[in-house]
């Protein structure tokens, strides 16, 4: 009975590895670059008006940032946005 449990555990871990390993290697998770750049523009919660740039899936687009909150798809310049999000 002990060997059956060990074999079951090894089989389970092997299947888990085979299922999750490709996801870990995919571009969607490569150093967070794609995930951040896929976020929508988010103005944030305040009423200030700062010109910022976000990546819209194709290029960087200007938007008005309220000054607080929002998400990480927010860059001070178009150049910074493209450097972070444009595909090589």
Swiss-Prot record:
Disulfide bonds join 37-85, 60-81. The keyword Signal applies. It comes from the Eukaryota. Residues 37-85 form the BPTI/Kunitz inhibitor domain. Its main location: secreted. GO terms for molecular function: potassium channel regulator activity; serine-type endopeptidase inhibitor activity; toxin activity. The record marks 47-48 as: Reactive bond for trypsin. GO terms for cellular component: extracellular region. CDD domains: Kunitz_huwentoxin (cd22598). Residues 28-33 form a propeptide. It is found in: Secreted. Keywords: Disulfide bond, Protease inhibitor, Secreted, Serine protease inhibitor, Signal. GO terms for biological process: envenomation resulting in negative regulation of voltage-gated potassium channel activity in another organism. Serine protease inhibitor that inhibits trypsin at a molar ratio of 1:1. Belongs to the venom Kunitz-type family. 01 (intermediate) subfamily. This is Kunitz-type U15-theraphotoxin-Hhn1n.
């Amino acid at each position: 009975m002990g060997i059956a449990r060990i074999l079951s555990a090894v089989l389970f871990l092997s299947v888990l590895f085979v299922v999750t390993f490709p996801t870990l290697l995919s571009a969607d998770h490569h150093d967070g670059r794609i995930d951040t750049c896929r976020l929508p523009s988010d103005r944030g919660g305040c009423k200030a008006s700062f010109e910022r740039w976000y990546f819209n899936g194709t290029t960087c687009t200007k938007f008005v940032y309220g000054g607080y909150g929002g998400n990480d798809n927010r860059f001070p310049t178009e150049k910074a946005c493209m450097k972070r999000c444009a595909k090589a």
